[in-house]
Amino acid sequence: MSTLVSLPGATPVAAPDYQSLERPLNFTESAAAKVKSLIQEEGNLDLALRVYIEGGGCSGFQYGFEFDENRAEDDLAVQTSGVTLLVDPLSLQYLMGAEVDYTESLTGAQFVIRNPNAKTTCGCGSSFSM
C-alpha cells in the first residue's frame, strides 16, 4: 500500500512500501560507531540518529541530522551495531537505497549520504535535486 506524499515544491510521488524490503537504507558500521560515540558523550542511551530531508540548500533539497528520543509509529528504524537510525516516511521516499556513512579525511570528518536517487548534488554534498 502506498500513499502520495511530497515536500513543498516537489512533485507528489507514491511513498515506498519499505516494510517489503529487507534493508531500504544502509547505515554503515563507520556511521554507527560515530553515532554510538556521540550518544555516549551525551549520556542518553535512548537517543537515535534521525536523518531527514527538507526543502532548501543550493540544489533544492537538503539533508538534516539530529538526535531524537522519539520514534513515530511509521518511522523506519535501521539497526547497526546496537545503534538506531530513524527516517520518517516522507524523507524515506527520497532516501530509498541510500547509504548513511561517516568519513574522515584531511579535509575533515562528516556524515555522508550516498543517494542513488539524487540527480545532482552540490559541492559540499549536503543538498541535492531530484
UniProtKB/Swiss-Prot annotation:
The keyword Amino-acid biosynthesis does not apply. InterPro entries: FeS_biogenesis, FeS_cluster_insertion, FeS_cluster_insertion_CS, FeS_cluster_insertion_RrpA, HesB-like_dom_sf. Keywords: Iron, Iron-sulfur, Metal-binding. GO terms for cellular component: cytosol. Iron-sulfur cluster binds at C58, C122, C124. Gene3D superfamilies: HesB-like domain (2.60.300.12). GO terms for biological process: iron-sulfur cluster assembly. Binds 1 iron-sulfur cluster per subunit. GO terms for molecular function: 2 iron, 2 sulfur cluster binding; 4 iron, 4 sulfur cluster binding; iron ion binding. Its cofactor is iron-sulfur cluster. Belongs to the HesB/IscA family. Required for insertion of 4Fe-4S clusters for at least IspG. Homodimer. HAMAP family: Fe_S_insert_ErpA (MF_01380). PANTHER family: IRON-SULFUR CLUSTER ASSEMBLY 2 HOMOLOG, MITOCHONDRIAL. This is Iron-sulfur cluster insertion protein ErpA. It comes from Stenotrophomonas maltophilia (strain R551-3). The lineage of its organism: Bacteria, Pseudomonadati, Pseudomonadota, Gammaproteobacteria, Lysobacterales. The gene is erpA.
